[in-house]
A protein has these predicted regions:
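Long, position-biased, composition-driven segments near the start of the mature protein
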Residues: 2-4, 93-95, 436-440
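A short, structural micro-pattern
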Residues: 44-46, 70-72, 82, 186, ...
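Short acidic, glycine/tyrosine-flanked loop/strand segments centered on an H-E-D-like triad
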Residues: 73-102
């Protein structure tokens, strides 16, 4: 017997899944120094830049006869020029028939996802201090736009790792901290941020060592945690930037010093090298790290002096390129560097001998950028944006990243459009001599 042909209606419903958000590992906001978070409230400060002091530097003379030296107030600036927003809009019909259909408004879930997205964007921007790639922005017709420049005053010039050899053991971490301290370092509050994917091999090698108490803790959490004396705190992030190096680093080319912009060695901020590929437009990229090589025939090994005391350390001289540099038709490349190198006596002397022709240096290839921060040297500003009268405005806080933001709700009169905007402005700076980049294979 044949089945009858029924005419049945199908009703598709939209059900809540209650799935959690795919969160990121947010630590930069957590470890930042928020002393200048609301610097716009400082009465005497005008503009979006606040300047703060760095410890003064002096030198010591032998004997009891004084040789007076200038007292110099060292400063660094924190510029609040970053801004971002996440927004969405609905018609009145969409609002009543879809977004607020449930007893619990779906608007809350839209807002939660928007806040998480913006928080991750800000966290990733803070991480760019690791390779000095935070963009310099300006305001044009109300919109924040990049100028093409970078905040090269922020971020480390020293580094650990070669970008090729894996960093996967506690011994390497211990050597890294030893190198960091050898130059001069704060005694408390050292923080290390590692790529999350590099944590398991480090923990794995640690579990192979006979350290029952430490290994019990690690096996329970599978985290590096803290170790050392005094303890060093280890964090992990999945938002760390990758330094895209120039040809010099990726081709492992050896550069040879031709000249510097200051032959006296009093203030070297630019070095001309030979040895790059002829007419290579991408020889050096801003943020590239270079290290002077040892055992060059007829040349003294370059070493940094300790930051305080001016004693020759064990640390080879490492520098950071502050701008892209192209090679000319002879394979020469002129590199602007940070920090300024000084071999002449004085409070800011930082190297043992002058940089002269014939010395050699090599740059790192592409690498993932981990970071060491000494104490509270990573500063963050995140001022509260004003209310947007007559639209309802509130201050929001993202519990996962710690980001503070403004939320504004409004409608376009007569246009059947209602929108929600989450926005924030901020700035950050990492004191160079208080930090070190960790070069993991990219």
């Amino acid at each position: 017997m044949a089945l009858p042909t029924n005419v049945l209606q199908q009703v598709q419903t939209y059900q809540r899944s209650n799935l959690a958000l795919l969160e990121n590992l947010n630590c930069f906001m957590n470890v930042s120094n928020t002393r200048f978070k609301d610097f716009e409230k400082i009465t005497a400060n005008l503009g979006s830049v606040v300047t703060f002091d760095l410890p003064p530097r002096f030198t010591t003379a032998q004997g009891l006869v004084a040789s007076f030296q200038p007292a110099v107030q060292r400063v660094l600036s924190l510029t609040c020029d970053q801004a971002t927003n996440t927004s969405y809009a609905f018609t009145a019909q969409e609002r009543i028939f879809n977004v607020e259909k449930d007893t619990e408004s779906y608007m809350e879930l839209f807002g939660r996802s928007a806040v998480a997205e913006m928080g991750a964007n800000i966290e990733a921007n803070l991480a760019l201090n690791s390779n000095s790639h935070v963009p310099v922005n300006t305001v044009v017709n109300g919109q924040t736009v990049p100028t093409g420049a970078l905040h090269t005053e922020s971020g480390p010039f020293r580094f650990f790792g070669d970008g090729v050899t894996p960093i996967n053991s506690f011994q390497q971490l211990a050597q890294m901290i030893a190198n960091f301290k050898n130059f001069g370092s704060v005694q408390q509050g050292i923080k290390v941020i590692l790529p999350d994917v590099n944590i398991p091999p480090i923990v794995g090698t640690g579990l192979n060592q006979f350290a029952p108490k430490r290994n019990d803790d690690m096996a329970m959490s599978w985290e590096v945690g803290e170790f050392g004396t005094p303890p060093v705190m280890y964090y992990q992030s999945n938002l760390l930037p990758t330094q895209t190096a120039g040809t010099v680093g990726n081709s492992a080319q050896t550069l040879t010093v031709v000249s510097t912009n200051d032959p006296t060695g009093a203030n070297i901020t630019q070095i001309t090298f030979s040895g790059a590929t002829v007419n290579d437009a991408n020889a050096i990229k801003s943020g590239d790290l270079l290290q002077f090589q040892d055992n060059v025939s007829g040349k003294t090994n370059l070493r940094y002096l300790t930051f305080i005391g001016h004693v020759i350390s064990n640390q080879p001289v490492q520098i950071r390129a502050t701008a892209d540099a192209a090679a000319d038709g002879s394979g020469n490349v002129v590199i602007n560097i940070s920090p300024a190198l000084q071999s002449t006596a004085g409070g800011t002397q930082n190297i043992n001998v002058n940089v002269i022709a014939g010395m050699q240096a090599k740059a790192l290839p592409n690498h993932k950028c981990g970071l060491i921060i000494g104490g509270d040297a990573f500063y963050l500003a995140m001022p509260r944006l004003p209310d947007q009268y007559p639209f309802p405005t509130a201050a929001e806080y993202d519990p996962d990243t710690g980001v503070s933001m403004r939320m504004t709700y409004g409608s376009l009169f007569g246009q059947n459009q209602m929108g929600m905007i989450h926005d924030s402005t901020w700035g950050s700076v990492l004191v160079p001599e208080y930090s070190m980049r960790i070069a993991f294979p990219a």
